[in-house]
Regions:
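Sec-dependent signal peptide cleavage junction
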Residues: 17-33
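Short amphipathic alpha-helical segments
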Residues: 5, 20, 27, 318-322
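Bacterial N-terminal signal peptides that target proteins for export
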Residues: 1-9
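Bacterial N-terminal signal peptides
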Residues: 9-18
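Nuclease and nuclease-like effector domains acting on nucleic acids or nucleotide cofactors
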Residues: 31-284, 292-322
């Protein structure tokens, strides 16, 4: 039987003026922990970007002002379709930098990792910033890291800052392993995204500031991310609800499950996408919006899942929805 595949996507963010790149890497969930990591590389070349040599105090003041004035830009979001939306992160690969040529010598580099960790055992989200490495003739005179978690009940609606930190490293504090983190305890299902602002400055060059934003994720009250599942045959991904606070209906108030829903869906699927030659006995027909939350038996609200995915990934997520 052909299998449905998970899709893990990678994000790349780059900034002009500074030779700064960022790579985001998502790890598979392990022991109830899912981690998203972005690696940010900030380099200043020997040719410099400021003609006037500035003092250490000037650089620190400029860096603080840049960091303060940088806004938290929201992420781009997919277009909802009715009551559902595909949350699957899209691949991003954007490079607006000028590639250094043979005459450009990189003198100073700092690498900072930012982390977004979902821990089901603690029912919490941790976000952190860590200096991974410092390379070059001189280290920065100031590094400022800041991170904010934003949450909302409506995918396309308003988001509020719920957990934030700012940390300034100077002098001997600027070292490999220097870290700042904060943990937020989940109590309700929410749409969540993280925004990081990073600033670094070396004497002799204007400070550089970078803002990076994750995708928007749907996370239940147990810090369990909504499963990202893709059907390679139909080309369709499992949609998510657009609301994190849907009303729960008593059994007597719900739409009744169609007893012939399985056969109807199989006929509909083959008619729309062609015969995948699956062993349908190993598949479950899942209601994207469950009946207990106002879902119905329409074909657009159904999605075929392997029994393992349905019972071990999707159903457990919904048990922690409210």
């Amino acid at each position: 039987m052909k299998k449905f595949a998970y899709s893990i996507f990678f994000m790349v963010f780059l900034l002009t003026a500074w030779l700064w790149t960022s790579d985001a890497e998502a790890s598979q969930s392990k022991d109830g922990i899912t981690t998203y990591k972005e690696t940010h590389v900030l380099e200043v070349d020997e040719n410099g970007h400021a003609k006037e040599i500035q003092s250490k105090s000037d650089i620190i003041d400029q860096a603080r002002q840049q960091f303060k004035n940088r806004p938290h830009d929201p992420p781009q979001r997919n277009m909802p379709h009715g009551d559902t939306v595909v949350l699957q992160p899209s691949t991003k690969n954007k490079n607006t930098n000028k590639t250094p040529d043979a005459n450009t010598k990189v003198a100073n580099t700092i690498v900072i990792d930012t982390l977004f960790k979902l821990d089901q055992s603690k029912k919490a989200i941790t976000h952190s910033s860590t200096i991974r490495s410092i390379i070059g003739k001189a280290k920065p005179v100031i590094v400022i890291v800041g991170s904010t978690l934003f949450v909302g009940d409506d995918y396309a609606g308003k988001y509020n800052a719920i957990s934030t930190y700012t940390k300034e490293f100077t002098g001997s504090q600027i070292k490999v392993g220097a870290t700042k983190s904060k943990t937020y305890k989940m109590v309700k299902t929410k749409f969540v995204y993280k925004s990081d602002i990073l600033t670094a400055g070396w004497v002799g060059s204007a400070p550089g500031t970078k803002q990076s934003t994750t995708e928007t994720y749907l996370v239940n009250k147990n810090a369990y991310q909504y499963p990202q599942i893709h059907n390679s045959h139909s080309g369709k991904s499992l949609p998510a609800p657009t609301k994190a606070n849907m009303k729960w209906y008593k059994p007597e108030d719900r739409v009744k499950r169609d007893k012939d829903i399985r056969n109807k869906y199989i006929r509909w699927y083959i008619g729309k996408y062609g015969d995948p030659k699956w062993d349908w006995s190993g598949l479950d027909i899942h209601h994207v919006i469950p009946l207990e939350y106002g879902g119905d038996n329409k074909m657009g609200n159904l999605y075929a899942l392997t029994r393992t995915l349905h019972q071990q990934e999707v159903s457990p997520w919904w048990r922690g929805y409210r």
